[in-house]
């Protein structure tokens, strides 16, 4: 079976160099073109998907829709989960990355962004970016609502959905596409390829580029793209 992972196309806040996290930012015009290009590439590879998964965030949802439209596969089932959302950047969400580095120092911002288990400062529950005020997360328990996540935290959030849903589709011998985010996809890739905590920090995923894995029904990875 084929498992295709794709990071959403460039978003408006990627373009503005801002921490995005769970903020529901749209694709930029370039991001839409990246998604179209990805769909054409996958169509040229003669890939046919049986099921798709994505997050609750429109930049990933729209990327998936554009890809499937280019492939003439908009009819397949699509499942959305908050567990595939981007890493929550806490109080940093909405801030310009360069300005944040000037305020806190390059070293501190680098630690927040690139360490495995250090989370950024927690978001204030009165902030406009606090997820619980968004109705799509209204049914989540307070304990499931992140105030800020490290990559380790993101992995702990993502993997239960892999085990409960995505992997089951592969075991049913279905071809699967997952459109999500840089850190939620790093979580899946780390697990699939057994990448160390140190090495995963060096994995940078390009926006809008499909990554094709071949996986057997026992969930063994038979082939994977060159990632580093």
UniProtKB/Swiss-Prot annotation:
<feature type="binding site">
    <location>
        <position position="59"/>
    </location>
    <ligand>
        <name>substrate</name>
    </ligand>
</feature>
<feature type="binding site">
    <location>
        <begin position="86"/>
        <end position="89"/>
    </location>
    <ligand>
        <name>substrate</name>
    </ligand>
</feature>
<comment type="similarity">
    <text>Belongs to the phosphoglycerate mutase family. BPG-dependent PGAM subfamily.</text>
</comment>
<dbReference type="InterPro" id="IPR001345">
    <property type="entry name" value="PG/BPGM_mutase_AS"/>
</dbReference>
<dbReference type="InterPro" id="IPR029033">
    <property type="entry name" value="His_PPase_superfam"/>
</dbReference>
<feature type="active site" description="Proton donor/acceptor">
    <location>
        <position position="86"/>
    </location>
</feature>
<dbReference type="GO" id="GO:0006094">
    <property type="term" value="P:gluconeogenesis"/>
</dbReference>
<dbReference type="InterPro" id="IPR013078">
    <property type="entry name" value="His_Pase_superF_clade-1"/>
</dbReference>
<feature type="binding site">
    <location>
        <begin position="113"/>
        <end position="114"/>
    </location>
    <ligand>
        <name>substrate</name>
    </ligand>
</feature>
<dbReference type="GO" id="GO:0006096">
    <property type="term" value="P:glycolytic process"/>
</dbReference>
<keyword id="KW-0312">Gluconeogenesis</keyword>
<keyword id="KW-0324">Glycolysis</keyword>
<comment type="function">
    <text>Catalyzes the interconversion of 2-phosphoglycerate and 3-phosphoglycerate.</text>
</comment>
<comment type="pathway">
    <text>Carbohydrate degradation; glycolysis; pyruvate from D-glyceraldehyde 3-phosphate: step 3/5.</text>
</comment>
<keyword id="KW-0413">Isomerase</keyword>
<protein>
    <recommendedName>
        <fullName>2,3-bisphosphoglycerate-dependent phosphoglycerate mutase</fullName>
        <ecNumber>5.4.2.11</ecNumber>
    </recommendedName>
</protein>
<feature type="binding site">
    <location>
        <begin position="182"/>
        <end position="183"/>
    </location>
    <ligand>
        <name>substrate</name>
    </ligand>
</feature>
<feature type="binding site">
    <location>
        <begin position="7"/>
        <end position="14"/>
    </location>
    <ligand>
        <name>substrate</name>
    </ligand>
</feature>
<feature type="binding site">
    <location>
        <position position="97"/>
    </location>
    <ligand>
        <name>substrate</name>
    </ligand>
</feature>
<feature type="site" description="Transition state stabilizer">
    <location>
        <position position="181"/>
    </location>
</feature>
<dbReference type="GO" id="GO:0004619">
    <property type="term" value="F:phosphoglycerate mutase activity"/>
</dbReference>
<dbReference type="Pfam" id="PF00300">
    <property type="entry name" value="His_Phos_1"/>
</dbReference>
<dbReference type="InterPro" id="IPR005952">
    <property type="entry name" value="Phosphogly_mut1"/>
</dbReference>
<feature type="binding site">
    <location>
        <begin position="20"/>
        <end position="21"/>
    </location>
    <ligand>
        <name>substrate</name>
    </ligand>
</feature>
<feature type="active site" description="Tele-phosphohistidine intermediate">
    <location>
        <position position="8"/>
    </location>
</feature>
């Amino acid at each position: 079976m084929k498992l295709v992972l794709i990071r959403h196309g460039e978003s408006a806040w990627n373009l503005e160099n801002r921490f995005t996290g769970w903020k529901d930012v749209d694709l930029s015009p370039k991001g839409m073109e990246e998604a179209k290009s990805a769909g054409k590439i996958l169509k040229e590879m003669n890939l046919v998907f049986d099921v798709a998964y994505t997050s609750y965030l429109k930049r990933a949802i729209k990327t998936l829709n554009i890809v499937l439209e280019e492939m003439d596969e908009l009819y397949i089932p699509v499942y959305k989960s908050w567990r595939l959302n981007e890493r929550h950047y806490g109080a940093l969400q909405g801030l310009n990355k360069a300005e944040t580095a000037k305020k806190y120092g390059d070293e501190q911002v680098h630690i927040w962004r690139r360490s495995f288990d250090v989370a950024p400062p927690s978001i204030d529950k009165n902030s406009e970016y606090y997820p619980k005020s968004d109705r799509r997360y209204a049914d989540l328990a307070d304990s499931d609502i992140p105030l800020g996540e490290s990559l380790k935290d993101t992995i702990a959030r993502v993997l239960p959905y892999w085990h409960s849903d995505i992997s089951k589709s592969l075991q049913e011998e279905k071809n699967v596409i997952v459109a999500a985010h840089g850190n939620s996809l790093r979580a899946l890739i780390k697990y699939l390829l057994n990448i160390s905590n140190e090495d995963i920090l060096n994995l940078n995923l390009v926006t809008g580029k499909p990554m094709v894995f071949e996986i057997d029904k026992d969930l063994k990875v038979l082939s994977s793209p060159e990632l580093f």
